[in-house]
């Protein structure tokens, strides 16, 4: 299985990749996986992280405003995009997380520069890799909709569950 991060890493290592070659590098053979790759490529193009040139080759945009970081959230609801030891952390407001969870590898765009001793503020544009594939949660009904509420209070988003599937334990 590929991630947005593996797509970007493969494109950064080359001058341009054709779709078939990218599929080979990512070891994609199934039609369903190719459909998922198409969706990911369109999303990355829309975010202006990659582009497709006139030769139908995909390239990584060098001067992109996006930074790769890891999300760290506190139980009090404060979230930061951590970039590394020597780089300043970026504050992410709860409504700008775009369903990123604590520990996820993400692409962040700075929307407000830091001043004095305040951190810059940013928005999560793309989740590159999920840190947790499994989420332990409790199921609650809110306004006739069914939600999974994460037990880990560092995960700030609730997940709406389909009503058709009545296998939820209450």
Language model segments and positions:
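Charge-lined substrate channels and their catalytic hotspots, especially those that engage the 3′ end
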Residues: 1-170
